Amino acid sequence: MFRLSAARTLAKSVNTVVAKRTYAEAADGALKLQFALPHQTLFSGTPVTQVNLPAKSGQIGILANHVPTVEQLVPGVVEVLEGSSSKKFFVSGGFATVQPDSTLAITSVEAFPLESFSPENVRSLLAEAQKNVSSADEVAAAEAAIQLEVLEALQAALK
């Protein structure tokens, strides 16, 4: 009888603890963002509140005092929150590195403001890429598969 009662009490207390901790608390200070492309620097040590990243391991929200980490970026939206404003950039991939001094460095081959894309153009490019995936030429099929992955992520971001 005691074991059954103790097991019920333990299970309830464990569930309560897990339910309380679901997201990070805002940290003191600001995150310093460096966002660089080969031809342009979008942010250079700019203090921001939070950055949301499309990482290979899943969506990640980075705040000041985040644990140091290196993440591979997948095609998706990088959202930069500065106070009450938000800027969204579509990246085709890249890397993000969080340093112990609350500096986030994002490097990507290309990044464009999300509002610069036309949903109609994305749909037509997506249809073309889907046709090319079944190409007999292996190189063309591989390139089309990569293009398809990027365009599907872009189409999802525009919805």
From Swiss-Prot:
GO MF entries: proton-transporting ATP synthase activity, rotational mechanism
Xref: InterPro entries: ATP_synth_F1_dsu/esu, ATP_synth_F1_dsu/esu_N, ATPD_C_fung, ATPsynth_dsu/esu_N
CC annotations in GO: mitochondrial inner membrane; proton-transporting ATP synthase complex
Keyword Repressor set for record: no
Pfam families: ATP-synt_DE_N, ATPD_C_fung
Family per similarity comment: Belongs to the ATPase epsilon chain family.
Protein name: ATP synthase subunit delta, mitochondrial
Organism: Kluyveromyces lactis (strain ATCC 8585 / CBS 2359 / DSM 70799 / NBRC 1267 / NRRL Y-1140 / WM37) (Yeast)
Lineage summary: Eukaryota, Fungi, Dikarya, Ascomycota, Saccharomycotina
